[in-house]
């Protein structure tokens, strides 16, 4: 799916497009969504009555996931929890599918906590980003997260597992189930795929032990859409900027008013562009690409053309995109800056209490 079609579908499925032609197209997709929802409900029931089996790892498992396709900030939340656990002295292993990597489907160690053993194009964006930015964090990839966890037990001896994007991975038993919900559109338009953005019906939210409401505005309250389940409020903030390759990080504020090309291949590139504008950057050109995009020669050439043709002083992208550009040897490489995304949890007590209660058992 190209970026413009993906953007249109996301607007349609999230309920932000409501014209008559849009509603007509949506109505054609609804029967498929009803069938998809029925299949997902049946699958959940089969796991609940144990006709489909979940397997348990010998160490506690903390799952971080969501109900919708696209970005709700899973990787920043996973990174935040990983850093907290490491600071508490635990040996932490992240279990990731390795989506988008050339070795997707293989079970392998991405990082042993000291050495990153793969490139981003092999293991995927998120495992490489976590491995390369969090010292001491172990990362194992595999479509079967139980097998990945057992490999980690054999080779790395972790104290606790973090299951990245694991809400629907019911084959693995988890001890703490954390659900992320976008503040503005927690359930999209309410439909499952393909008429909506839901991976499961909204009733699946009841499996959560803790809800983290992401992308909350700085000052507006974020009431929980799931009363009775403990919840936290989180927002994302762009922190320091890091030059691609060599160079020291510097504050985003130093780019205020500067002419920049913004590009990103993430779930919500336009949200990233808007955050750059809020920081005071002058976006003279934008280049939105599909999530998990591969930066081949054609993509690199397009970035170079946009950079020079727009008169931009710099090109700014996300740190997640940047991990796929580290080996870039091009004239424009010295002008590419990586924006670091930081997670701020305003009320962390429900999260830290849940983590401590689990690990002190």
Swiss-Prot record:
Annotated TM spans: none
Q: What is the reaction catalyzed?
A: a lipid A disaccharide + ATP = a lipid IVA + ADP + H(+)
Q: Give me the residues that bind ATP, please.
A: 68-75
Q: In which pathway does it act?
A: Glycolipid biosynthesis; lipid IV(A) biosynthesis; lipid IV(A) from (3R)-3-hydroxytetradecanoyl-[acyl-carrier-protein] and UDP-N-acetyl-alpha-D-glucosamine: step 6/6
Q: What is its EC number?
A: 2.7.1.130
* Record's keyword terms, sorted: ATP-binding, Kinase, Lipid A biosynthesis, Lipid biosynthesis, Lipid metabolism, Nucleotide-binding, Transferase
Q: Does the keyword Cell wall biogenesis/degradation apply?
A: no
Q: Does the keyword NADP apply?
A: no
Q: What does this protein do?
A: Transfers the gamma-phosphate of ATP to the 4'-position of a tetraacyldisaccharide 1-phosphate intermediate (termed DS-1-P) to form tetraacyldisaccharide 1,4'-bis-phosphate (lipid IVA).
Note the NCBIfam families from the entry: lpxK
Task: State what protein this is by name.
Answer: Tetraacyldisaccharide 4'-kinase
* Encoding gene per record: lpxK
